[in-house]
Amino acid sequence: NASSSLQIRGATSISASNDPLVVIDGVAGGDIRNLAAQDIESMTVLKDAASAAIYGTRGANGVILITTRKGAGEAGRAQVTYDSWFGVNLAKSGPDILSADEFRRSRRATDYGYSTDWYDLLLRDFSYDNNQYLSIDGSTKNGYYGASFNYKKATGLDLNSSREEFGGRFVLNQRMMDGIVELNGSLNARRVNEVWGNDGMFDTALSMNPTMPLYNEDGTYFQPTSPTGARNPVQELKEIDNNGQRVYLLGTAEVKVNLIRSEKQMLNTSLSYSLHYNDLKQHY
């Protein structure tokens, strides 16, 4: 479940971030991963220094301008969109290693009398991706409105990894007093629940004696005797909870006052907030 990264010009620093600046509806510092793909109306990449100069040093790695969808459709009539897809992932065959019988014939170590495919035991039969999206858009003679809701769930091919997302977005534009006052607002919120597996257990599984049992006779997990301190990889995946929660908020609010046609007074503010929480528990 490693986080993805995005680069425009390639790596320019060893220690500092190489990610471009993401500007969502005029708010700098957003994260493209926190938007539903269906909510994006347009995307522009500023690659040259001149175009990105307005953002100062923050735009040194390039700038991505994202405009999200606004309310649309015939005035007085709501437009409802529903998008759904589901995918299944299957693991390819594992690496070619000695079977239990081949291991016995090689006489490399103690024969415990079992035939255990440690690598296969770390894998699910399949994993899946589930994405659901619902939006409601509309317009009136004085403005527009829009709301969308998104749910994603994905599991990894290893026994203990998954990612679940809940997202919502709301946008509103309203003109009042014969167009003298105009209100604009938007709010994007997303919560992500993640469970991380341990890729290192696959390396452990490849080095395990395939004649060892998964369980002891009393039902407890068998533990190998190893000078390297290696433990039962299945137990490590099943009995260690390594999870995290992410909360993201991105909002804008704007008031425009047009008292004089040649002049326009405007007050705007924006909010960008993120909370990261990690929890590690060991149940043995």
Per-range role (PLM):
Residues 1-25, 41-42, 52-72:
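Extracytoplasmic beta-strand/coil segments of soluble accessory domains associated
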Residues 13-15, 29-31, 49-54, 71-75, ...:
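Short beta-strands and strand-coil junctions in structured, solvent-facing domains, enriched
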Residues 68, 82, 99, 134-138, ...:
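Residues on the lipid-exposed face of transmembrane beta-strands in outer-membrane beta-barrel proteins
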Residues 3, 61, 129-133, 165-169, ...:
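Transmembrane beta-barrel architecture of outer-membrane proteins
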Residues 4, 20, 76-93, 109-135, ...:
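Short strand-turn segments of transmembrane beta-barrel domains in outer membranes
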Residues 71-78, 141-142, 177-182, 260-268:
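Short loop/turn motifs that connect adjacent beta-strands in outer-membrane beta-barrel proteins
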